[in-house]
Amino acid sequence: MLYGALTAGIFEECGRFCMYKTVMRRYDGRAAAVTAGIGHGGIEAMTVSAASMALYLVFALCWNAGDTDALLKLAGSAETVQTVAASLGKYTVGYCLLACLERVSAMLLHISLSVFVFAAARSRAKRGYLAFAIGLHAIFDMPAALYQFGYVKQLFPVELWLAVCALYALRSARKCYLEECDA
């Protein structure tokens, strides 16, 4: 789990770093960091949330229409149909709110991480921000991995942790943006 969280941090933050050193090297204004963070977080939110929501919507429409053949074709097996149906049955307003909290937290984190990595890419003296971003990313991802593997049973503490991490990252990134990042 630690390996997975750390790997995600390394690949995403080093990817950001390479992006700032190559594709965005001409964008020297610090606002580029915020823009890149919004783009990264926004695309992730769309791919993670929209893809699963679209699947649930198609599944629910087939279920309500009584089209079991389409469900089996979509799911591949009767067991998968039962699993998705049980999952849809647990989909409450509270779950939707937690999903929104997670996406907002992830957006704030991606904006913050982009600011740190931008500072690291623009100044050798600030390369420590890259390691900080990798570590913060891993810390952010760890509770979700613990939940997925069953070590944490409740979703609310995980989402609360993500929100706290995102707010800490945002506060730290604001300081970096205002005081330490090149204008």
Which residues make up each language-model segment?
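Hydrophobic alpha-helical segments at protein termini of multi-pass membrane proteins
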Residues: M1-A183
